[in-house]
Amino acid sequence: ERGYLLTVKLSRAYSNLAVLGDHGVHGTDGEVDEDLIRHAIDLLESVRTQGENDPYWNSRMGYSCLMAYRSAATAYEYAKCWLALAPDDPAAQKLVRDCEEYLEEEKALELDLKEREEIIRKETPDDVKGGICK
């Protein structure tokens, strides 16, 4: 039976393989192997009760979630836990800052999209609106 530490290290190996690829399979396209990253997260979930208060577990969960969901919201929660458990860790501080930047970018893109939709609504004649969206 695999212990806690081995499970977390195995998860890291799967996460690295998902992001970096196997001998350049992913090349430089930035794609993440979704099956492998999901498996990495599943491994971490299997030891959640032992890991929730472990800075390393939270770091691995934060990085893996950031890669898996391409959204910083979930990763940010784990990054904050990691930072709370290891406030002097520069890597934890960096992940928190990175997630905050990603969240700001997502928010700006969402606001930009809403503004564009509003402009289109205002500039589209009512008879065209009725013909497009019934």
What are these regions (language model features)?
Residues N16-T28, R70-A72, C99-P125:
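Alpha-helical linker/edge segments of TPR/alpha-solenoid repeat scaffolds
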Residues R2-T7, E117-C133:
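N-terminal alpha-helical interaction modules that lie
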Residues A40, A75, A92, A108-D112:
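Solenoid-repeat scaffolds in large eukaryotic assemblies
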